[in-house]
Structure formats: structure tokens, C-alpha cells
Swiss-Prot record:
Residues annotated as the enzyme's active site: C142 (nucleophile)
Glycosylation sites recorded in the entry for this protein: N194, N258, N285, N341
Organism of origin: Rattus norvegicus (Rat)
Post-translational modification: N-glycosylated.
Tree of life domain: Eukaryota
Name listed for the protein in its UniProt record: Acid ceramidase
Amino acid sequence: MLGRSLLTWVLAAAVTCAQAQQVPPWTEDCRKSTYPPSGPTYRGPVPWYTINLDLPPYKRWHELLAHKAPVLRTLVNSISNLVNAFVPSGKIMQMVDEKLPGLIGSIPGPFGEEMRGIADVTGIPLGEIISFNIFYELFTMCTSIITEDGKGHLLHGRNMDFGIFLGWNINNNTWVVTEELKPLTVNLDFQRNNKTVFKATSFAGYVGMLTGFKPGLLSLTLNERFSLNGGYLGILEWMFGKKNAQWVGFITRSVLENSTSYEEAKNILTKTKITAPAYFILGGNQSGEGCVITRERKESLDVYELDPKHGRWYVVQTNYDRWKNTLFLDDRRTPAKKCLNHTTQKNLSFATIYDVLSTKPVLNKLTVFTTLIDVTKDQFESHLRDCPDPCIGW
């Protein structure tokens, strides 16, 4: 059923989206006065949990997953059903359950032990917890923004769009996995010695990070980058014994936890070999400290930085290289830039960034949450989102 409904949706969307991306009601004038969040595009707040880094890795996630185990099981079952819909023999999930646990020892610390602890506390097979974590390396469709006002103050915003082609619910026009991720969305305060090391918004059960900040120092978001030399190849290489690259979610978390400066973080994100192509959107705490790092798995292709002295007071990154045209079915870059230009540099705030991220198609059916970050003021907030019809699928 999932496979058939997905195929129907893809065929229909390919026809309609080509015409709809730049046509009302799928797009709209730049939104205003959407903040503080309310109304039909606001699903609700994201709950906070503390992750104690002083605990052994095996135990760090037990308290959180004791609350979230039922919804995590629901999502893992949905992913299994989707896989089985495309490979009815069940051999893919059999391989996940039988082969992946044997690779846990090759996952770098502390991530392997954290996954083992999550599997035990939830009762979900370890292989499926590992695959759940791999899953985030491959399906992240996002919009990230860094801005700088006339006084050199930086803001960082992002829409987390996730779940493309992962089951379409024809009864309510939503992506199955996107909707099931919303109750799994959590704000995390990672602490050591009862003091915050970094904060992040993530999904319960995932030990990497995609969105976070280190108070007073830096902010970091991760967007997927589509490439022929893509994440599937990197994951397969890792599974077959080539372990010289880091998972992108792991390197993001490591930078948030351990980096001591914007420049150090930029150097790590630019030079470290990674399993999947990606965009790292990195912000600092001083004028000009904001960039988009475009990565292949083994090298950096481009570092595009804020340059306010020459009029570049924002950077916008979706899922396409900045020097290339976006796919005509999926242009979130143009409306985001249009709305930022309409906002103007002198009016930058959490409210106006949220307005930009609330404007269709920047906001779309894949949007799980919106995050706003002010590094220097130690402000970090995330909000669950909805995109009621009429709304584009991505």
C-alpha cells in the first residue's frame, strides 16, 4: 500500500510541481507577523531534555528514550514497511538485523555504545537502530540562513525538511515519515559537570547532530548535498570495511562538543573526509563569521562567506550548489533570498527570519521544525511546523 501510494504521488507531483513551484497558492508573498509562532503553520513547542556527558555512553540516552520509545518504534516500523514495500522478499531488513550489529565495534566512540544503549532501553533491534542513524545521512532536505545586521550581529535560522519519498499519506496529504518525526523532535542540552557544552535540536534515537550551537562561540547546521558520488557509496564503503571517513552527523556533533573557535570548526569541516556529500552552514560570534562549506566526500569544493563590507550580509543554502541552478521542481533558494532582500539588513531579528522560513515553498510538506539561533545572546529555539493545504510537497 505504501509503495503504491508513493508511486502515485511521485508521478502526480512530477507533473504538478513543475508548474506549481512559482505559482500561487503553492507560493505566496513574503510572510509577515508570523512570530511569536502561532496559527495553522505552528504545530507546537519542542520539549527540552538534558544529556549528561558525564554518564557512560551506554546510559546517556536512557531517560529520554524511556519517554520516546513508543514513537521511535512506530517510526522504525514505518521505515521497515517502506523498505519491504520496495523489496518484498524482506532480505534488506534481514540483512539489517543480522549484519549491521556486527559492525557496531567499528563505529567510533562514543556513538556505538550510545546506539547499543538506545537499542537495549527501547527493545528495538540494534541493527535497526544503526540503520535509523544511517537514515539521517541520506534524506535531509533543508534551508539554512545566516545573516549579519549593520552592527555585526549574527543570526542563524533553519528549516529541517525531512522524509522526501518516504511514504505519502493520501488521506491527509502528508509525508508519513515527516509526520512521525515530529513527536520524536527534541531539544537537547548536552552538559558536563552540570554546565552546558552545546545545545541541539534532533530526533530521539539519533546520536549524530544536524542542528546546534555552542553558546557564545558558534552555530552549525547540516544540509544534504546531492551528488553522483553520494552518501550511498560512502555508507557502502563503510559497511564493507573502509572506515577512513566520518559520518556527517558525527562530525557535526564532534565540532559542537569540542571546537574552541569558529576558525577551528571551519578547518575541521573543510578538511575531514566524510561518508556523504554535505553542506555545512557555520556561524560564529563576530562580524564576517558565517559561511557555507560545500563538501564532496573527500574534499571541499567551496567556502562561501559573509562579506558585509561588500554587501553580502546573508548566505542562504538549500540542497544545491550555489553556482548552479536549482532543480525546477524544488526552488526554495529564490523565495528565501527574495524575502531576505525584502526584509532588508536593518530589520533582521528572530521575527523576520521566522517570517522568511514560514513563506511557501521555503515552508513545505517536508518541514518538521524551524530553528532560530543567536550565538552571542545564548538564544536557541525550535518550533514544530505544519504546512496546511494548499502546500507544495517539497
